[in-house]
Amino acid sequence: MAMNLPADNEGKIKLAMSILVTIINDTGVPRNIRRAAANALTHLRDPRLSPAVRAANAISALEEVSQDPNMPFYARTRIWQVITILETVRD
């Protein structure tokens, strides 16, 4: 199913943040994955940086755990979804 992305960077970041919050609140996801999602969320909320830099920092935090063998498949799909959304954020 195709997802319609918001046209503006802040809309994309808010969409990514909402997906990250669902991962953080899911107790079926291992703690290290939730911690990485929380770290990515912190990067996205940093007002001192431009949207593209915030997105790049969050992607970096998520890519470290995206191949974790203990991650449930649905969580991996959500992580990849967030990365895909954030890759479209440009300054």
From Swiss-Prot:
Query: What residue ranges carry the coiled-coil annotation?
Result: none
What sections of the protein cross the membrane? Answer: none
Which InterPro entries does the UniProt entry name for this protein?
Ta0600-like_sf, UPF0147
Alphabetical list of Gene3D superfamilies matching this protein:
Ta0600-like
Q: Which family does it belong to?
A: Belongs to the UPF0147 family.
Protein name, entry field: UPF0147 protein APE_2336a
What organism does this protein naturally occur in?
A: Aeropyrum pernix (strain ATCC 700893 / DSM 11879 / JCM 9820 / NBRC 100138 / K1)
